Amino acid sequence: MTKDEVKKLRMNSPESLQFLNNATKFYNLMMMYRCAIREIQTKLEVLDDEFSVENNRNPISFIKTRIKQPNSIYDKLQKMGYEFTTENIQTYLNDVAGVRIVCAFIDDIYMISDLITQQDDVKVIEIKDYIKNPKSNGYRSYHMIVEIPVFFAKGKTPMRVELQIRTNGMDFWATLEHQLRYKKGIEEMPGYDEISEELLHSARAIIEADNEMQRIKDKIGMFHEI
């Protein structure tokens, strides 16, 4: 239903009441996803604080969160062949709520993943390791879909959240690559294949730097706790 169609509806008509009911359900669901993000973020901040006290460093550089935009949710459901309903959003989409965890070193990524997995109220739905198995464009990150219970006034609801865990270098590359590659019409421009190769080369350079920093950390760790 378009905005113009909504404006033409009388507020007491069946169509307008149905629209308002669906909108209310959608915004309530987005609130629930925001709450799920806060639950995950709190877990991560607790782990980071504990590690800071015990090891005098923070494995997590920073955390970013996001809720998928309504247009993106709609488009994804359409591609999957489902109607835009709150029931279908909860059933078929795992990445409406997203948390990006950026770490200092590669081994911090797997440590954070293990610590989250070990928590008894966290259910791991799916793992995709794009660090050991990078995408063809050079993208590297560790993805997890987790389900956690969120407590509301009417009871407990299991909510799914996508976690993306990566190093500072991986995040730097992924952010800039997204800005460069998704400019409108870039795929039709001359030299696009060369640009793709250059981006892939830069991704390889960054993982080499990440691996080198990990080796240096491991050497220091033989004599000093890190």
Label for each model-derived stretch:
Residues 1-37, 41-51, 162-226:
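An acidic, glycine-/histidine-flanked metal-binding catalytic module
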Residues 29, 33, 37, 70, ...:
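Generic alpha-helical secondary structure
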Residues 31, 35, 68, 72, ...:
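Charged, alpha-helix-enriched surfaces in structured cytosolic catalytic cores
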Residues 37, 41, 45, 74, ...:
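Generic solvent-exposed, charged/amphipathic alpha-helical segments
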Residues 50-51, 82, 120-125:
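Short secondary-structure junctions
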Residues 56-97:
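A glycine-rich, hydrophobic loop/mini-helix early in the fold
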Residues 90, 103-213:
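Long beta-strand-rich cores associated with HINT superfamily self-processing modules
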Residues 98-102:
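Short aromatic/hydrophobic contact patches that present stacked aromatics
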